[in-house]
Amino acid sequence: MKKYNLTAVMLLFTLALCAQTPQWESLFNGKNLKGWEKLNGTAEYKVANGEITGISKMGTPNTFLATKKMYADFILEFEFKVADGLNSGVQFRSNSLKEYMNGRVHGYQFEIDPSSRAWTGGIYDEARRGWLYPLTEYPSAQKAFKSGEWNKARIEAIGNSI
């Protein structure tokens, strides 16, 4: 079992619900995983020092940590730090339905990829169409990710736009 600092996935998750009076809502309380559930694989998640850390298990299916609450239009801002050799991401507008591939998580993913292909920030459609927005045509975006450092990201999902 290999341990990776997957604080990436959930540290400082905040969400702005786009309603008549938008208010920021923190998705992670910094203490425990209340309001979250683990889906699919067998990786583990723990909370320490106000951070969520994922512990991957080699050779097992993808594991997802998901909020129990569904959101419509939103702005999601988060910070992440990921170990080399790990491929991760932040799912959004995603589901896990029994009738679809036996509950496999599917939907959009903000890619976190510390490999040399440098696709962090690209959009991948998990368990459906594959790459929707790889960063191969955007070298400046590929250079934005800093391996071994804290990175910031923002996802805006308003109406049909991401």
Per-region residue spans from a language model:
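Bacterial Sec-dependent N-terminal signal peptides
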Residues: M1-P22
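Carbohydrate-interacting regions of secretory-pathway proteins
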Residues: Q20-I162
